[in-house]
Amino acid sequence: MYIKKICLFGCTADPFTPAHMAMVEAACKIHDIVVIIPTIVDYYRAGKTKWLSDDQKLEVINAFVNKSKFWHKIIVDDHEFQLRTRLSFEQLANRRFYHTLNDMISKYSENGMNEICMMIGSDSYINFGTWYAYDKILNILGDNRLYVVTGRNGMTNELLPTYKFLNENGKLQDYHINTFKIDDRFKDMSATKIRAKYSDYKTYLDDVLD
């Protein structure tokens, strides 16, 4: 039986940017399926204000995906948005990506027959040790199944930290990551900067949604 390599990519998507899409397309080249998971937990945890509604986020993401030559390898999963209809505010506030990862593995692993990987940017990886249950995330994924996008803000492989995880024998060891770069045009692009320069992004967004 063929084992599919499925890469999970969680992001707040507020907004989803060309840099996000460049990451997704790079992951498509080495995975069978890439699952984009727009998340909601950051807003509850950090007290942030949403810029785009859930529906707007999905519209933007799907517009990017529909224009991609890898559209057939990409799934947009609104799992976290659907949680709003089932969970209370307090329950949502206690959600972390660890919980979503478990949900996604149950949904896509096909009882362990598929290989589940995860992709994050180097800026997120730098702070990965502060994530809720980060060590359990590494344990669940297994060694060498975390993909980190480098090159942003001068970040190189040598500057990335090393985290520990429990291997299959229950011994603590260094976790090995995979790294790759995206086009230099997108290396300094971030949702935060785009929100600060809304008018410039809106022109690009109008072209995407056209």
Predicted segments, located by residue:
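Nucleotidyltransferase catalytic core that binds NTPs
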Residues: 1-210
